Amino acid sequence: MADKLPYKVADIGLAAWGRKALDIAENEMPGLMRMREMYSASKPLKGARIAGCLHMTVETAVLIETLVALGAEVRWSSCNIFSTQDHAAAAIAKAGIPVFAWKGETDEEYLWCIEQTLHFKDGPLNMILDDGGDLTNLIHTKHPQLLSGIRGISEETTTGVHNLYKMMANGILKVPAINVNDSVTKSKFDNLYGCRESLIDGIKRATDVMIAGKVAVVAGYGDVGKGCAQALRGFGARVIITEIDPINALQAAMEGYEVTTMDEACKEGNIFVTTTGCVDIILGRHFEQMKDDAIVCNIGHFDVEIDVKWLNENAVEKVNIKPQVDRYLLKNGHRIILLAEGRLVNLGCAMGHPSFVMSNSFTNQVMAQIELWTHPDKYPVGVHFLPKKLDEAVAEAHLGKLNVKLTKLTEKQAQYLGMPINGPFKPDHYRY
């Protein structure tokens, strides 16, 4: 049984360093600290056996310890082979929480790690906390006998949410799920402001390239693409956007970006960033037209946006510069610099999003787990959202850290607007 192996990490000796990093992160994660203050005594997650599959970072470690403080048992794996921060994993293992994650897993090891999270000493998992859908898919396809005992899934990211809706449409989804990604305090903060900071961190750590004056091509102009485009423009790049959606394309044009196709943009760019969550965004024909030493990276969840297989099969030479940085020599004499093997550049080459913005996302995760565990009758099989009032509560929990002072409605104003004096302040369809 899996419970015979308490953990598997790169180096348990990194635990002390990891604990120091967690202590600092906690001070930057007021939402999770609020959850501990509110619920540590009542332990609403008592009895929950949560299998988690989400990037094993310092911030995730704070989330894990929050879930445990609220009464849950937790077993954890990372949702990406390169995203684990080994000191964070070691700190969690040292705290006695089963974790199976290390930076640089093989694809086989990655699946093995997920498998280790399914069985607890008192029985199999009964809750899922997922990022990207790999854990959800594994249980539905390989372990369907466990589905009847699972109360719910909370899904972190755009790719995983697409997966849930696809499963629902095909009649495959068997467990209630909460779409955490589309909570306003997740998608409009983590996806936008998080990527705005962590993309540049990843590119700079990997290449130390001067961004000012370069042409940067951003594939996709959703919340992630918007954050990436803002960051690159802020550093002085001329940014080109590619898009399939006319609304997003118009938004990009109105912000002053050139919008064109990848077939055109590939000839101009010095830096390429894919943000789409789709397949086949940068292909062989694009590589062949790129400038010498074009930098290519991805910040979408999976490694399917960039055709890395084409590079490996068609390049004359591949030179590893350092971990997660490879330089390919093409037959035309031009070189392509690929970051993180086409996987998440901000986690493969840097530390991911800052703690503060992840506190937004992870507070939503905690609330979703509490909702699904304590109110199962409210959530039939399907894909659900957190109530607007909880979304606003997540935002409110982070205002004090930024010295924000909210204006309060008067009774007259509330009556005039036709809303409760303490919110919710916007209808569910409001887009922010």
Swiss-Prot record:
SUPFAM superfamilies reported for this sequence: Formate/glycerate dehydrogenase catalytic domain-like, NAD(P)-binding Rossmann-fold domains
Gene3D superfamilies given in the database record: Adenosylhomocysteinase-like (3.40.50.1480), NAD(P)-binding Rossmann-like Domain (3.40.50.720)
Main localization (coarse): cytoplasm
EC number: 3.13.2.1
Biological process annotations from GO: chronic inflammatory response to antigenic stimulus; circadian sleep/wake cycle; one-carbon metabolic process; response to hypoxia; response to nutrient; S-adenosylhomocysteine catabolic process; S-adenosylmethionine cycle
Pathway: Amino-acid biosynthesis; L-homocysteine biosynthesis; L-homocysteine from S-adenosyl-L-homocysteine: step 1/1
Protein name: Adenosylhomocysteinase
Role: Catalyzes the hydrolysis of S-adenosyl-L-homocysteine to form adenosine and homocysteine. Binds copper ions.
Gene Ontology molecular functions: adenosylhomocysteinase activity; adenosylselenohomocysteinase activity; adenyl nucleotide binding; copper ion binding; identical protein binding; NAD binding
